[in-house]
């Protein structure tokens, strides 16, 4: 498949042009024109790039790519090494950030919800696109039982704050990655619990004072599943070899 054709397919599937983001979505570093093998992963780290090189991949597809609005634009140091490795090996880099968070089928929120048996997802924000969502547990659970399910699914123990929250969790707000600031929106909606990847100092106060369960399950851990699902979708619909590589990150 042609590299630019792949970008068009991904842009269309994720409706990337409709979402305002703080990183470019699409082909970020151009390599060879013909793509047969793709490595997917959460972040375009040096370790992921070197793995792609070892597998003779033609492209890398990630959730966390490069060229964020707040980052130094100079191509030097760590970023210079990463980009040089891509260019020397003629590997394309595709990155999709918010479009992959919010996609109703393949998105990080949607995939995590499915794994945790949270159904009937609804937007928490007003407007055409909502980054956080909320839904209903298939079976109501205690905080301990829900934490155990998170640990079983994500293979990591979540940080839990359940002070002053209801005994049973029926409704859950979700925003994977660094979405902890949406806890107030979830509390205003009246949901019983909120799960994100990260936690801030003020998040715990928000949870305690508003009587909502809070679970922080890891930025990386909560965002494995969107990019994995996107790669699986590509391999099912196109003549492409796609492999998900998990470069573990405890954060």
Swiss-Prot record:
A divalent metal cation 1 binds at residues 63, 101, 223. GO terms for molecular function: metal ion binding. Disulfide bonds: none annotated. A divalent metal cation 2 binds at residues 64, 219, 223. Pfam families: DUF34_NIF3. Keywords: Metal-binding. One of its GO terms (cellular component) is cytoplasm. Homohexamer. This is GTP cyclohydrolase 1 type 2 homolog. The lineage of its organism: Bacteria, Pseudomonadati, Pseudomonadota, Gammaproteobacteria, Pasteurellales.
